[in-house]
Protein backbone atom coordinates (compact mmCIF):
# COMPACT_ATOMS: atom_id res chain seq x y z
CA UNK A 1 0.00 0.00 0.00
CA UNK A 2 2.86 2.38 0.80
CA UNK A 3 4.27 1.77 -2.67
CA UNK A 4 0.85 2.59 -4.12
CA UNK A 5 0.68 5.83 -2.14
CA UNK A 6 4.08 6.78 -3.52
CA UNK A 7 2.89 5.98 -7.04
CA UNK A 8 -0.25 8.08 -6.60
CA UNK A 9 1.81 11.06 -5.42
CA UNK A 10 4.09 10.66 -8.43
CA UNK A 11 1.12 10.48 -10.82
CA UNK A 12 -0.57 13.51 -9.24
CA UNK A 13 2.66 15.47 -9.70
CA UNK A 14 2.85 14.39 -13.35
CA UNK A 15 -0.75 15.47 -13.96
CA UNK A 16 -0.09 18.83 -12.30
CA UNK A 17 2.99 19.42 -14.43
CA UNK A 18 0.98 18.49 -17.53
CA UNK A 19 -1.84 20.90 -16.69
CA UNK A 20 -4.42 18.16 -16.06
CA UNK A 21 -6.82 17.46 -13.24
CA UNK A 22 -9.40 14.73 -13.22
CA UNK A 23 -10.98 11.53 -12.00
CA UNK A 24 -9.18 8.20 -12.60
CA UNK A 25 -10.11 4.67 -11.59
CA UNK A 26 -8.86 1.23 -12.65
CA UNK A 27 -10.53 -1.92 -11.27
CA UNK A 28 -9.66 -5.59 -11.59
CA UNK A 29 -13.02 -7.06 -12.59
CA UNK A 30 -12.22 -10.45 -11.05
CA UNK A 31 -10.83 -9.43 -7.65
CA UNK A 32 -12.46 -6.02 -7.24
CA UNK A 33 -9.10 -4.47 -6.33
CA UNK A 34 -8.93 -0.90 -7.58
CA UNK A 35 -6.62 2.08 -7.67
CA UNK A 36 -7.54 5.63 -8.56
CA UNK A 37 -7.06 9.36 -8.28
CA UNK A 38 -10.10 11.35 -7.12
CA UNK A 39 -12.45 8.68 -8.53
CA UNK A 40 -15.56 10.30 -7.05
CA UNK A 41 -15.05 13.76 -8.55
CA UNK A 42 -18.12 14.68 -10.60
CA UNK A 43 -17.48 16.03 -14.10
CA UNK A 44 -19.56 16.77 -17.21
CA UNK A 45 -19.49 13.62 -19.32
CA UNK A 46 -19.54 15.03 -22.89
CA UNK A 47 -19.95 12.09 -25.31
CA UNK A 48 -19.68 9.46 -22.57
CA UNK A 49 -23.43 9.98 -22.14
CA UNK A 50 -23.80 7.96 -25.35
CA UNK A 51 -23.16 4.79 -23.33
CA UNK A 52 -26.30 5.03 -21.14
CA UNK A 53 -28.19 6.27 -24.22
CA UNK A 54 -27.17 3.16 -26.16
CA UNK A 55 -27.96 0.83 -23.27
CA UNK A 56 -31.43 2.35 -22.80
CA UNK A 57 -32.17 2.16 -26.53
CA UNK A 58 -31.00 -1.45 -26.74
CA UNK A 59 -33.15 -2.42 -23.77
CA UNK A 60 -36.21 -0.83 -25.39
CA UNK A 61 -35.45 -2.81 -28.57
CA UNK A 62 -35.27 -5.99 -26.47
CA UNK A 63 -38.62 -5.17 -24.85
CA UNK A 64 -40.22 -4.58 -28.25
CA UNK A 65 -40.87 -0.89 -27.56
CA UNK A 66 -38.53 0.19 -30.36
CA UNK A 67 -37.90 -1.53 -33.72
CA UNK A 68 -34.19 -1.67 -34.47
CA UNK A 69 -34.93 -1.91 -38.19
CA UNK A 70 -37.10 1.21 -38.23
CA UNK A 71 -35.83 3.80 -40.71
CA UNK A 72 -35.41 7.27 -39.20
CA UNK A 73 -35.06 10.36 -41.38
CA UNK A 74 -32.20 12.39 -39.98
CA UNK A 75 -31.66 16.03 -40.87
CA UNK A 76 -28.11 16.97 -41.90
CA UNK A 77 -25.89 18.20 -39.08
CA UNK A 78 -24.07 20.73 -41.29
CA UNK A 79 -21.44 21.20 -38.57
CA UNK A 80 -18.23 22.65 -39.96
CA UNK A 81 -16.09 23.03 -36.82
CA UNK A 82 -13.35 20.40 -36.32
CA UNK A 83 -14.27 17.28 -34.37
CA UNK A 84 -17.81 16.06 -35.10
CA UNK A 85 -18.19 12.95 -37.24
CA UNK A 86 -20.69 11.05 -39.38
CA UNK A 87 -24.17 12.47 -39.89
CA UNK A 88 -23.11 15.58 -37.98
CA UNK A 89 -21.18 16.64 -41.09
CA UNK A 90 -23.78 15.54 -43.65
CA UNK A 91 -25.17 18.20 -46.00
CA UNK A 92 -28.37 16.37 -46.93
CA UNK A 93 -31.05 14.34 -45.11
CA UNK A 94 -30.48 10.61 -44.68
CA UNK A 95 -32.62 7.62 -43.71
CA UNK A 96 -30.90 5.37 -41.18
CA UNK A 97 -32.13 2.35 -39.20
CA UNK A 98 -32.19 2.61 -35.41
CA UNK A 99 -29.62 -0.22 -35.15
CA UNK A 100 -27.27 1.70 -37.43
CA UNK A 101 -27.82 4.93 -35.49
CA UNK A 102 -26.59 3.01 -32.44
CA UNK A 103 -23.39 2.11 -34.29
CA UNK A 104 -22.86 5.68 -35.48
CA UNK A 105 -23.57 7.15 -32.05
CA UNK A 106 -21.43 4.75 -30.03
CA UNK A 107 -18.61 3.55 -32.29
CA UNK A 108 -18.18 6.71 -34.40
CA UNK A 109 -19.36 9.18 -31.71
CA UNK A 110 -21.77 10.83 -34.14
CA UNK A 111 -23.72 13.46 -32.18
CA UNK A 112 -26.46 13.82 -34.78
CA UNK A 113 -27.09 10.07 -34.62
CA UNK A 114 -27.23 10.37 -30.82
CA UNK A 115 -29.82 13.12 -31.03
CA UNK A 116 -31.96 10.96 -33.32
CA UNK A 117 -31.83 8.29 -30.60
CA UNK A 118 -32.65 10.86 -27.91
CA UNK A 119 -35.76 11.74 -29.93
CA UNK A 120 -36.83 8.10 -29.45
CA UNK A 121 -35.74 7.83 -25.80
CA UNK A 122 -35.50 11.32 -24.24
CA UNK A 123 -32.85 12.20 -21.64
CA UNK A 124 -35.27 11.95 -18.71
CA UNK A 125 -36.26 8.42 -19.74
CA UNK A 126 -32.63 7.37 -20.21
CA UNK A 127 -31.84 8.66 -16.72
CA UNK A 128 -34.83 6.86 -15.23
CA UNK A 129 -33.66 3.56 -16.74
CA UNK A 130 -30.11 4.17 -15.52
CA UNK A 131 -31.48 4.76 -12.01
CA UNK A 132 -33.56 1.59 -12.16
CA UNK A 133 -30.38 -0.36 -12.99
CA UNK A 134 -28.79 1.11 -9.86
CA UNK A 135 -26.36 3.66 -11.31
CA UNK A 136 -26.97 6.66 -9.03
CA UNK A 137 -24.02 8.82 -10.06
CA UNK A 138 -24.67 9.02 -13.81
CA UNK A 139 -26.89 11.98 -14.70
CA UNK A 140 -28.56 12.48 -18.09
CA UNK A 141 -30.09 15.94 -18.50
CA UNK A 142 -29.79 16.95 -22.14
CA UNK A 143 -29.18 15.79 -25.70
CA UNK A 144 -25.99 16.13 -27.71
CA UNK A 145 -27.33 19.10 -29.66
CA UNK A 146 -26.59 21.34 -26.71
CA UNK A 147 -22.93 20.31 -26.82
CA UNK A 148 -22.64 21.98 -30.23
CA UNK A 149 -23.73 25.32 -28.77
CA UNK A 150 -20.62 26.18 -26.77
CA UNK A 151 -18.15 29.09 -27.12
CA UNK A 152 -16.04 26.85 -29.41
CA UNK A 153 -18.66 27.28 -32.16
CA UNK A 154 -18.54 31.08 -31.84
CA UNK A 155 -14.85 31.51 -32.57
CA UNK A 156 -12.89 30.98 -35.75
CA UNK A 157 -10.58 27.95 -35.59
CA UNK A 158 -7.56 30.24 -35.20
CA UNK A 159 -9.14 31.62 -32.01
CA UNK A 160 -10.15 28.27 -30.48
CA UNK A 161 -7.80 28.93 -27.57
CA UNK A 162 -10.13 31.73 -26.45
CA UNK A 163 -12.97 29.25 -25.93
CA UNK A 164 -10.64 27.03 -23.93
CA UNK A 165 -9.46 29.98 -21.85
CA UNK A 166 -13.11 30.73 -20.99
CA UNK A 167 -13.73 27.07 -20.13
CA UNK A 168 -10.76 27.10 -17.76
CA UNK A 169 -11.40 30.45 -16.09
CA UNK A 170 -15.19 30.64 -15.77
CA UNK A 171 -15.76 27.82 -13.28
CA UNK A 172 -16.48 28.04 -9.55
CA UNK A 173 -15.10 26.08 -6.62
CA UNK A 174 -18.40 24.17 -6.45
CA UNK A 175 -18.06 23.14 -10.12
CA UNK A 176 -20.61 25.62 -11.34
CA UNK A 177 -19.74 27.27 -14.65
CA UNK A 178 -20.79 30.15 -16.90
CA UNK A 179 -20.79 27.65 -19.78
CA UNK A 180 -23.85 25.48 -19.01
CA UNK A 181 -22.37 22.37 -20.66
CA UNK A 182 -19.55 22.53 -18.09
CA UNK A 183 -21.79 23.22 -15.06
CA UNK A 184 -22.34 20.02 -13.06
CA UNK A 185 -25.76 21.28 -11.95
CA UNK A 186 -26.94 21.59 -15.57
CA UNK A 187 -24.84 19.20 -17.65
CA UNK A 188 -24.82 15.44 -18.09
CA UNK A 189 -22.45 14.28 -15.36
CA UNK A 190 -20.65 11.26 -13.94
CA UNK A 191 -17.60 10.08 -12.05
CA UNK A 192 -14.84 7.62 -12.84
CA UNK A 193 -16.31 5.25 -10.24
CA UNK A 194 -19.79 5.45 -11.77
CA UNK A 195 -18.45 4.54 -15.20
CA UNK A 196 -16.32 1.69 -13.83
CA UNK A 197 -19.45 0.35 -12.11
CA UNK A 198 -21.26 0.51 -15.46
CA UNK A 199 -18.38 -1.23 -17.25
CA UNK A 200 -18.26 -3.96 -14.62
CA UNK A 201 -21.99 -4.61 -15.08
CA UNK A 202 -21.56 -4.72 -18.88
CA UNK A 203 -18.68 -7.23 -18.72
CA UNK A 204 -19.93 -9.37 -15.81
CA UNK A 205 -21.71 -11.87 -18.12
CA UNK A 206 -18.46 -12.76 -19.91
CA UNK A 207 -16.18 -13.04 -16.87
CA UNK A 208 -15.65 -16.80 -16.82
CA UNK A 209 -13.29 -17.23 -13.87
CA UNK A 210 -14.09 -17.18 -10.14
CA UNK A 211 -14.99 -13.79 -8.65
CA UNK A 212 -14.89 -14.37 -4.88
CA UNK A 213 -17.23 -11.99 -3.10
CA UNK A 214 -17.94 -9.97 -6.27
CA UNK A 215 -21.46 -9.01 -7.26
CA UNK A 216 -22.33 -6.65 -10.12
CA UNK A 217 -25.47 -4.75 -10.93
CA UNK A 218 -27.60 -6.92 -13.19
CA UNK A 219 -28.10 -5.71 -16.75
CA UNK A 220 -30.14 -7.50 -19.43
CA UNK A 221 -27.61 -9.77 -21.20
CA UNK A 222 -28.62 -9.01 -24.81
CA UNK A 223 -28.25 -5.19 -24.58
CA UNK A 224 -25.02 -5.62 -22.60
CA UNK A 225 -23.56 -7.92 -25.26
CA UNK A 226 -24.43 -5.54 -28.09
CA UNK A 227 -22.97 -2.55 -26.25
CA UNK A 228 -19.73 -4.46 -25.66
CA UNK A 229 -19.58 -5.07 -29.43
CA UNK A 230 -20.15 -1.39 -30.17
CA UNK A 231 -17.41 -0.35 -27.74
CA UNK A 232 -15.01 -2.87 -29.28
CA UNK A 233 -15.69 -1.22 -32.66
CA UNK A 234 -14.83 2.27 -31.39
CA UNK A 235 -13.01 4.13 -34.18
CA UNK A 236 -11.51 6.83 -31.93
CA UNK A 237 -8.34 5.17 -30.68
CA UNK A 238 -5.90 8.04 -30.22
CA UNK A 239 -6.29 8.52 -26.46
CA UNK A 240 -5.96 5.44 -24.23
CA UNK A 241 -5.77 2.74 -26.91
CA UNK A 242 -2.02 3.21 -27.61
CA UNK A 243 -1.30 2.19 -24.01
CA UNK A 244 -3.88 -0.59 -23.69
CA UNK A 245 -4.38 -2.29 -27.07
CA UNK A 246 -1.85 -4.87 -28.26
CA UNK A 247 -1.59 -8.32 -29.82
CA UNK A 248 -2.03 -9.66 -26.28
CA UNK A 249 -4.87 -7.38 -25.16
CA UNK A 250 -8.15 -6.06 -26.56
CA UNK A 251 -9.41 -2.58 -25.73
CA UNK A 252 -13.12 -1.65 -25.92
CA UNK A 253 -14.01 1.94 -25.09
CA UNK A 254 -15.87 5.21 -25.54
CA UNK A 255 -14.32 8.67 -25.64
CA UNK A 256 -15.76 12.05 -24.71
CA UNK A 257 -14.44 15.50 -25.62
CA UNK A 258 -15.78 18.99 -24.98
CA UNK A 259 -13.69 22.16 -24.81
CA UNK A 260 -11.06 21.40 -22.12
CA UNK A 261 -12.62 18.04 -21.17
CA UNK A 262 -10.95 14.85 -22.40
CA UNK A 263 -12.41 11.53 -21.27
CA UNK A 264 -12.25 7.84 -22.08
CA UNK A 265 -13.70 4.78 -20.37
CA UNK A 266 -13.16 1.19 -21.40
CA UNK A 267 -12.21 -2.38 -20.60
CA UNK A 268 -8.90 -4.09 -21.37
CA UNK A 269 -9.00 -7.89 -21.68
CA UNK A 270 -5.58 -9.54 -21.46
CA UNK A 271 -4.67 -12.82 -23.11
CA UNK A 272 -3.67 -14.19 -19.68
CA UNK A 273 -7.28 -13.79 -18.52
CA UNK A 274 -7.00 -10.59 -16.48
CA UNK A 275 -9.69 -7.98 -17.18
CA UNK A 276 -9.61 -4.36 -16.02
CA UNK A 277 -12.15 -1.56 -16.25
CA UNK A 278 -10.59 1.87 -16.79
CA UNK A 279 -12.22 5.29 -16.47
CA UNK A 280 -10.40 8.57 -17.09
CA UNK A 281 -12.22 11.91 -16.95
CA UNK A 282 -9.97 14.98 -17.19
CA UNK A 283 -9.94 18.75 -17.39
CA UNK A 284 -7.04 20.60 -18.99
CA UNK A 285 -5.77 23.87 -17.57
CA UNK A 286 -3.97 24.65 -20.84
CA UNK A 287 -5.93 26.95 -23.21
CA UNK A 288 -5.28 25.04 -26.43
CA UNK A 289 -7.49 22.93 -28.69
CA UNK A 290 -4.90 20.37 -29.83
CA UNK A 291 -3.03 18.77 -26.91
CA UNK A 292 -1.46 15.44 -27.89
CA UNK A 293 0.68 15.64 -24.78
CA UNK A 294 -2.43 15.65 -22.59
CA UNK A 295 -3.82 12.63 -24.45
CA UNK A 296 -0.55 10.76 -23.91
CA UNK A 297 -0.36 11.74 -20.24
CA UNK A 298 -3.90 10.50 -19.56
CA UNK A 299 -3.00 7.14 -21.05
CA UNK A 300 0.30 6.87 -19.20
CA UNK A 301 -1.33 7.57 -15.82
CA UNK A 302 -4.11 5.05 -16.47
CA UNK A 303 -1.64 2.42 -17.67
CA UNK A 304 0.55 2.80 -14.60
CA UNK A 305 -2.47 2.36 -12.35
CA UNK A 306 -3.33 -0.80 -14.29
CA UNK A 307 0.27 -2.02 -14.14
CA UNK A 308 0.30 -1.65 -10.35
CA UNK A 309 -2.90 -3.67 -10.04
CA UNK A 310 -1.42 -6.41 -12.24
CA UNK A 311 1.41 -6.72 -9.72
CA UNK A 312 -0.94 -7.34 -6.76
From Swiss-Prot:
- Quick check: keyword Transcription in the entry? yes
Domain of life where this protein originates: Bacteria
Which keywords are on file for this protein? Transcription, Transcription regulation
Among the record's GO biological process terms, what is one? beta-lactam antibiotic catabolic process
Q: Name one Pfam family in it.
A: Beta-lactamase2
Keyword Transcription assigned to the entry: answer is yes
Residues crossing the lipid bilayer are none
This chain belongs to the protein called Beta-lactamase regulatory protein BlaB
Tell me the lineage of the source organism: Bacteria, Bacillati, Actinomycetota, Actinomycetes, Kitasatosporales
Q: Which gene encodes it?
A: blaB
